[in-house]
Regions:
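Active-site gating/interface segments in enzymes
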Residues: 1-124
Length: 124
């Protein structure tokens, strides 16, 4: 399972070119590749090219990519519950990023990366 996420802001550009390779003798392989991208503003761009290169017959592999913006409905909901627009945007961005951060298997590293991500999101 491969999960790659990106947030592109202002004039930023994100590029994802991932490949899952399954050799001929790797029968019964299961693999999934996913790339999710969040655009903040009209000047941001993302180019996504997930790829599967499969030479085995008996496999279960798939891939997908999404490009989207912050949910206006979710922002509205959070503002109606007292969050400022800025905090609602930050919360939505952090939730998007945290889906990757929480999968980090190294004990003690998750908190550090959460802090770095939150600091970066605060500057967006």
């Amino acid at each position: 399972y491969e999960l790659v996420k990106a947030i592109a802001a202002d004039g930023g550009t994100g590029v994802f070119g991932g490949r899952i390779y399954v050799a001929q003798d790797a029968q019964r392989t299961q693999a999934y590749q996913r790339n999710n991208n969040l655009l903040l503003g009209d000047a941001a761009h993302v180019y996504s090219k997930p790829q599967l290169e499969i030479y085995a017959d008996n496999v279960k592999c798939s891939h997908g990519a999404t490009v989207g913006r912050l949910s206006a409905e979710a922002l509205y909901y959070m503002r109606q519950r007292g969050l400022s627009d800025r905090d609602a945007r930050r919360l939505q961005m952090f939730g998007f990023a945290n889906q990757v951060i929480e999968k980090i298997p190294v004990e003690g590293l998750t908190g550090t990366i959460e802090e770095l991500a939150a600091a970066k999101i605060d500057r967006m």
